[in-house]
């Protein structure tokens, strides 16, 4: 099995690539320095020389606040770059796996979002990821669009590791408690991507995230509890902590309970550190 992985040096890529090794897949792990997905001419010239079975498109502009500041760059990567990769997938007649986000929804629901629910992103990041989804659906039927939420894991900058570092030097922190989410371990998501590569899943859109729901304050407390860190967590409202990008109030996805609970996965992740 021959696979192109874009954004392989990112948070999810660093978890996924060793799993690809474990199943004996041949893969080309790329990053923006050697494979600029926004440069259609370069992408086509390179891909004309290779044969593939899958494209796993992880490359993205993921900094939600910076997307508001650098809107052109966010759309260039998440929209145009994804469009280019969809065209390559169509040209080579291979499936493309695209990682999208719960941010394509506005957060006004009170129950987990289904794949069939109407999208309505409220920030540039969500809008750009949705535009990527739309390009893929328009260009190729052979696609797996995976929406996920609030990733953490080894090998990259993420909230969980940031809190562990913070706890080494501080005794208290204020964290919002009116944003509901489903934080997801990159290992769990990577396993589901491997399952897709194994075959049998219909093309389409999937929600893959940890089961259950929490808020940022509760999630932070759990991190400190598991690692026995003495840090007081003060719940605050998101209105008390203004940021450049609007955040949905509710970002829980209906995943059919295919993954473990967020508590179980968080504990497994932290106990190995």
Annotate the PLM regions:
Residues 134-181, 187-188, 194:
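NAD(P)-dependent short-chain dehydrogenase/reductase
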């Amino acid at each position: 099995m021959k696979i192109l992985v874009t954004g392989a040096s990112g948070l999810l890529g660093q978890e996924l690539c060793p799993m690809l090794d474990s199943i004996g897949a041949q893969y080309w792990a790329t990053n923006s320095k050697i494979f600029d997905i926004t440069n259609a001419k370069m992408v086509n010239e390179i891909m004309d020389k290779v044969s593939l079975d899958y494209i796993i498109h992880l490359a993205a502009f993921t900094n939600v606040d910076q997307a508001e500041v650098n809107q052109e760059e966010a759309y260039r990567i998440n929209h145009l770059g994804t469009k280019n990769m969809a065209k390559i997938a169509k040209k080579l007649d291979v499936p493309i796996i695209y990682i999208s986000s719960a941010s394509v929804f506005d957060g006004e629901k009170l129950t987990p979002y289904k794949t069939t629910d109407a999208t309505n992103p409220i920030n540039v990041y969500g809008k750009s990821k949705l535009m990527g989804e739309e390009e893929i659906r328009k260009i190729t039927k052979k696609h797996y669009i995976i929406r996920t939420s609030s990733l953490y894991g080894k090998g990259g900058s993420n909230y969980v590791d940031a809190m562990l570092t913070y706890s080494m030097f501080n005794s208290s922190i204020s964290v919002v408690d009116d944003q509901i989410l489903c934080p997801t371990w990159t290992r769990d998501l990577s396993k589901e991507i491997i399952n897709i590569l194994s075959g049998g899943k219909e093309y389409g859109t999937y929600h893959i995230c940890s089961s259950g729901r929490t808020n940022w304050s509760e999630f932070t407390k759990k991190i400190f509890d598991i690692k026995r860190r003495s840090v007081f967590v003060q719940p605050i409202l998101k209105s008390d902590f203004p940021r450049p990008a609007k955040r949905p109030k509710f970002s829980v996805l209906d995943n059919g309970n295919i993954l473990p609970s967020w508590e179980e996965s968080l504990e497994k992740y932290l106990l190995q550190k």
